[in-house]
Amino acid sequence: MTKLSKRVKAIQSKVDRNKFYPLEDALNLVKECATAKFDESIDVAVQLGIDAKKSDQVVRGAVVLPAGTGKHVRVAVFAQGEKAEQAKAAGAEIVGMEELAEQIKGGKIDFDILIASPDTMKIVGTLGQVLGPRGLMPNPKVGTVTPDVATAVKNAKAGQVQFRVDKAGIVHASIGRRSFEPAALKSNLLALLEALNKAKPPASKGIYLKKVAVSSTMGAGVRVDQASLQAAA
């Protein structure tokens, strides 16, 4: 049996895994349990009332978190001409066409988000085997294939996060860092939940947002009371 460290034991003693905590209490508790020697990510897991095996119930989208993510995001853009200049002006670190495609094929991927103008998808489409497994393939459903590349770059820089339900019907996302104030984490979480509600598939029946839990990178999961979420919305 693996021996638990004092830090892990201390965390486990603070969190009642059978309890549903009011939203503010849950966020404060997660911050309190984030005791690692780095600025831990604060994450959320949302169990949705869908059948993830059915194609008409796949939940996917993107949302700009009002308080940002606390991360510096490097953005690459496939664009040419005026759109390339607009992307650069908006803050994109990398802008290109064929040369950028060759770099990606060669394994040089020094960006976090890839955006593409629709007229470049003939080139981008050849990169699916490289970008797909890394979750970097541009997609119009999350706003990364768009004629308005400048706005897409600004959104990425402002703290946009992409979400997609996994095979278990759960959406995982980061809503900030331990250094964030509880109010900032709260506003980010509520923005994410609002986006999830807007992305609800028509085929979904019954309770849609079934369970919500927050955690830090090295901390325990804290379940959130649904009534407190509805009151805060």
Curated annotation (Swiss-Prot):
This is Large ribosomal subunit protein uL1. One of its GO terms (cellular component) is cytosolic large ribosomal subunit. PANTHER family: 54S RIBOSOMAL PROTEIN L1, MITOCHONDRIAL, LARGE RIBOSOMAL SUBUNIT PROTEIN UL1M. One of its GO terms (molecular function) is tRNA binding. InterPro entries: Ribosom_uL1_bac-type, Ribosomal_uL1, Ribosomal_uL1-like, Ribosomal_uL1/biogenesis, Ribosomal_uL1_3-a/b-sand, Ribosomal_uL1_CS. The keyword tRNA-binding applies. One of its GO terms (biological process) is translation. SUPFAM superfamilies: Ribosomal protein L1 (SSF56808). Part of the 50S ribosomal subunit. CDD domains: Ribosomal_L1 (cd00403). Gene3D superfamilies: 3.30.190.20, 3.40.50.790. Binds directly to 23S rRNA. The L1 stalk is quite mobile in the ribosome, and is involved in E site tRNA release. Protein L1 is also a translational repressor protein, it controls the translation of the L11 operon by binding to its mRNA. It holds the Pfam family Ribosomal_L1. Belongs to the universal ribosomal protein uL1 family. Keywords: Repressor, Ribonucleoprotein, Ribosomal protein, RNA-binding, rRNA-binding, Translation regulation, tRNA-binding.
